[in-house]
């Protein structure tokens, strides 16, 4: 089979949104080459095991390559891709330079093209994300290994917003909690939460493709075999009392989620949010505070912010 590689040059902040657009246009998989990821993966960070000198990568911005089968007439979908990427400015994301190129590939090229960019990566003190096809053994006591298939979009755990959420989860999980993952994408946060000892996990995403991607990754991790994953619009129609709610989604979507999170969170519980770019941080923080939460932690990685908010008990 012949394949077509479509590559979009964009900004670091627009990476995951662009990847999602490419998947929705019919891609069978994506490859993300983000300069910011490599800046955050210096050899001395968390004992990183990647030798950057051996990996070809961009030094600024990002390139997302998507792979389309011959059943997709790519010249017809490229204008739509360009238009949708340009419209990301409506969500506070700058997708520039938004340059699109197209290359014909053989089946063999497609099968291996993106794998050279994906290696075991230590993303927190205790978590290492490993591609599904690689053999890997923990190198330190207490290390938790998560396996992901990066052939789908929705993140591989190395994006700054995902790291912020993972680091936050390490600070609030004690074991046995009930957690809700809103906008689960790849399912990486749900898998990590189970590995850290959470009891029950509900994972939701509006996109059916994301739900399928998450289920694929859940199946790769026996610890997450009982995670409930389903399509849903944020927490609309959900009526539960969770100990932790985590959302790695854009700020514009976090804002309407806040009252839903407040309704579905136990007193004494935590709301973790990331996906918040610099110029949206203050409005998100204000919205969370006005809903009755206390901000207990604010973290930042590059232009991205993470928030941990606590819902006080009557005794607090």
Curated annotation (Swiss-Prot):
Annotated disulfide bonds: none
A Pfam family reported for this protein in Swiss-Prot or TrEMBL: PrmA
Top EC class of this enzyme: transferase
Chain positions recorded as S-adenosyl-L-methionine binding sites: 162, 183, 205, 248
The protein's Enzyme Commission number: 2.1.1.-
Family the entry assigns: Belongs to the methyltransferase superfamily. PrmA family.
PANTHER family: ELECTRON TRANSFER FLAVOPROTEIN BETA SUBUNIT LYSINE METHYLTRANSFERASE
Name by which UniProt lists this protein: Ribosomal protein L11 methyltransferase
Species annotation: Lactiplantibacillus plantarum (strain ATCC BAA-793 / NCIMB 8826 / WCFS1) (Lactobacillus plantarum)
Lineage: Bacteria, Bacillati, Bacillota, Bacilli, Lactobacillales
